[in-house]
């Protein structure tokens, strides 16, 4: 008999500036993409936020960039209504963090202690 293991694989994104959670989602320098499998971090990747220097619509453009990376959730300090709407329409959960420590944000996410934006 073959045993089938259920593997919970997900990706979360964090907007970062100087290795801290950015207070401005759309204008952050970079995004950290964290792959989680069965509650454990498997990989971290840093990507440039190519939308951040735009004149208008940087939040929605940044949201589209992240969505195209296949993320399931994003952790932010703040997010504008248009960027939030993009994530909501795509079924990507948005969580609010009250700390700027990236490690603490990830830890709180894994423990289910971050509040969802609604």
UniProtKB/Swiss-Prot annotation:
It holds the Pfam family Nitro_FeMo-Co. Gene3D superfamilies: Dinitrogenase iron-molybdenum cofactor biosynthesis domain. Signal peptide: none annotated. InterPro entries: Di-Nase_FeMo-co_biosynth, DiNase_FeMo-co_biosyn_sf, MTH1175_dom, NifX/NifY_domain. Disulfide bonds: none annotated. This is Uncharacterized protein MJ0580. The lineage of its organism: Archaea, Methanobacteriati, Methanobacteriota, Methanomada group, Methanococci.
